[in-house]
Amino acid sequence: MAFKDTGKTPVEPEVAIHRIRITLTSRNVKSLEKVCADLIRGAKEKNLKVKGPVRMPTKTLRITTGKTPCGEGSKTWDRFQMRIHKRLIDLHSPSEIVKQITSISIEPGVEVEVTIADA
């Protein structure tokens, strides 16, 4: 018995493409930019649609304290501040590929948050 050629090509299973947002936060700008560049380079090697890095406004946390522990003496103050930098990267790809991209070595002090939504 011979098989008939119907002219149809075999149907490949559709891979669900998600909109993936990667949020990076850090106190150190150099390490944050290095991780951003590594993520984007990995995504471009896989021919993914990339938007970003979007530089969000820097949050500056300030604390002002009196220098003397007892409150006596001259009124001198210490001012401390911590700057938190944030970057957003948007990808359009299947979630399996994102697992491969985000498996790169991430600098210490950089926090990574991955949010997946349907495209």
From Swiss-Prot:
It is found in: Cytoplasm. The keyword Cell membrane does not apply. The modification Phosphothreonine is found at T9. The keyword Ubl conjugation applies. The modification N6-succinyllysine is found at K8. Keywords: Acetylation, Cytoplasm, Isopeptide bond, Phosphoprotein, Ribonucleoprotein, Ribosomal protein, Ubl conjugation. GO terms for biological process: translation. Its main location: cytoplasm. The modification N-acetylalanine is found at A2. The modification N6-acetyllysine is found at K34, K75. InterPro entries: Ribosomal_uS10, Ribosomal_uS10_CS, Ribosomal_uS10_dom, Ribosomal_uS10_dom_sf, Ribosomal_uS10_euk/arc. Signal peptide: none annotated. PROSITE patterns: RIBOSOMAL_S10 (PS00361). GO terms for cellular component: cytosolic ribosome; small ribosomal subunit. One of its GO terms (molecular function) is structural constituent of ribosome. It comes from the Eukaryota. Pfam families: Ribosomal_S10. There is a cross-link at K4, K8 (Glycyl lysine isopeptide (Lys-Gly) (interchain with G-Cter in ubiquitin)). Polyubiquitinated by ZNF598 via 'Lys-63'-linked ubiquitin chains when a ribosome has stalled, initiating the ribosome quality control (RQC) pathway to degrade the potentially detrimental aberrant nascent polypeptide. Deubiquitinated by OTUD3 and USP21, antagonizing ZNF598 activity. Ufmylated by UFL1. HAMAP family: Ribosomal_uS10. Component of the small ribosomal subunit. The ribosome is a large ribonucleoprotein complex responsible for the synthesis of proteins in the cell. PANTHER family: 30S RIBOSOMAL PROTEIN S10 FAMILY MEMBER. Belongs to the universal ribosomal protein uS10 family. This is Small ribosomal subunit protein uS10. It comes from Pongo abelii.
